[in-house]
Amino acid sequence: MANKKTLTPTSLPASLTLPEERKAEKALLFGLLASRKSLPEIAFRIRPEMFTHPDIALAIEAYLSLHGKGEGTDILSVEKEIRRLSPERAGQLPDLFELARQDGYMEVGGEFVRQHCQYIREAFVARRLILRCHELAHK
């Protein structure tokens, strides 16, 4: 059975690799940090469960929560919303800028956010399709 939040089934063969876009996830987060104007363009296109990196998924959940309430999405507001949404994880998360730059990923500005969003959506749909096929094949 798949975990709805991360879409990781417990019985998935080790030889099967699910598609993911970790660099695009980090670039999208960095783009949102760099330009708050990017969020309204993509808010209706993304959901936290589309992200494979759990810390980035939580940050996106915070961004979308604030956006949905019509509140500002500056870094302090996002970090405060993360603490509200997940107090048990909030203290364990790295700084949002560090999270976006982990693994030495090159910084990307807000102008590419829409394209990175598309990469993330495509990988999410592919993961769901693979997992559903796997589930049906093993019923």
Whereabouts are the PLM-identified features?
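Noncatalytic partner-interaction/assembly domains of nucleic-acid and motor enzyme complexes
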Residues: 2-123
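Amphipathic alpha-helices that form helix-helix packing interfaces
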Residues: 129-136
